[in-house]
């Protein structure tokens, strides 16, 4: 089940979301919900959705090429074009070509969020968005291109590949520090890759970590700013990214779950993960070694 953390911040965000859809001049929320439900009804058609996205790909099309691309009759497509036009999602130009309105374009941008959640509905029966701020949840459609990877062996393998493919940087938000990932990231840092990470105060760390860090030259890399690190109270959502690809692990029962991830090298997916990392980095505190227990 998709849930949100029940804390003051999240409750305030949910209230703000409720206020967001209110506006002056409406009698009550029922009127707004009724209007929204009417628009959902217009979108509850595979052909009408296809028409919208065909127009998004290439704005301004006549009915004939649309019907051909959709493999439908002109009469059938015309009927759906009329419905979309009446709802304000598209408009018909004087030359007979159809194009998306601002409203129609915006709806196409919002649909990927529904697509992402519906495509991975089974996954989100057990996982949730944890402590992700609402403003990022509202951008969940940017994650729609992500591939779902399941199994700790496969997720760690993909994690290592993100390290391997990095040429500029690796950024991470960590709930634990997997021992098998230490050597791969250290080698990349020594080859000039910038490493920044945020770790939970309660992070699980391998035995002998301190000794290994000293022998590896980790602290010298930290001194010359090749490595920068911060700390936050807890980490529910784990993120790993380089300059061109990213992974995200959502929590299960409020705890970070490294056995399943979403991965993509799509620019929009990467942008979401990078923005989220920067948000957490800005709001994280100073790294305190004594809080990590081996």
Region spans (language model):
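HKD (HxKxxxxD) catalytic microenvironment of the phospholipase D
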Residues: 227-269, 277
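Basic, Lys/Arg-rich alpha-helical nucleic-acid-recognition elements, primarily the DNA-binding modules
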Residues: 2, 7, 11, 16-114
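Primarily the HKD phosphodiesterase
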Residues: 161-217
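HKD-type phospholipase D/PLD-like phosphodiesterase module
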Residues: 202-240
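Amphipathic alpha-helical dimerization/coiled-coil segments
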Residues: 13-28, 112-169
């Amino acid at each position: 089940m998709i849930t949100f953390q029940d804390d003051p911040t999240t409750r305030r965000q949910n209230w703000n979301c409720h206020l967001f859809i209110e506006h002056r001049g409406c009698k009550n929320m029922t009127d707004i919900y009724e209007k929204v439900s009417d628009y959902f009804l217009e979108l509850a058609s595979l052909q009408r959705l296809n028409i919208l996205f065909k127009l998004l790909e290439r704005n301004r099309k006549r009915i004939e090429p649309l019907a051909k691309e959709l493999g439908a009759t002109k009469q059938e497509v015309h009927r759906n074009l009329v419905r979309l036009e009446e709802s304000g999602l598209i408009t018909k130009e004087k030359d007979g070509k159809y194009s998306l309105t601002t409203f129609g374009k915006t709806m196409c941008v919002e649909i990927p969020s529904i697509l992402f959640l519906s495509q991975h509905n089974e996954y989100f029966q057990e996982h949730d968005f944890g402590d992700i701020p609402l403003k990022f949840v509202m951008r969940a459609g940017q994650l729609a291109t992500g591939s779902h990877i399941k199994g700790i062996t496969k997720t760690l393998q993909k994690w290592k590949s993100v390290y391997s493919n990095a040429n500029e940087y690796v950024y991470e938000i960590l709930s634990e520090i997997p021992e098998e990932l230490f050597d791969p990231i250290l080698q990349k840092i020594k080859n000039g890759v910038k490493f920044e990470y945020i770790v939970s105060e309660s992070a699980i760390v391998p035995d002998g970590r301190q000794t290994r860090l000293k022998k590896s030259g980790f602290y010298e890399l930290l001194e010359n700013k090749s490595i920068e690190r911060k700390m936050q109270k807890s980490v529910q959502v784990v993120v790993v990214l380089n300059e061109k690809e990213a992974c995200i692990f959502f929590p299960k029962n409020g705890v970070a779950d490294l056995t399943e991830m979403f991965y993509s090298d799509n620019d929009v997916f990467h942008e979401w993960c990078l923005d989220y990392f920067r948000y957490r980095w800005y709001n994280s505190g100073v790294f305190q070694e004594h809080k990590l227990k081996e």
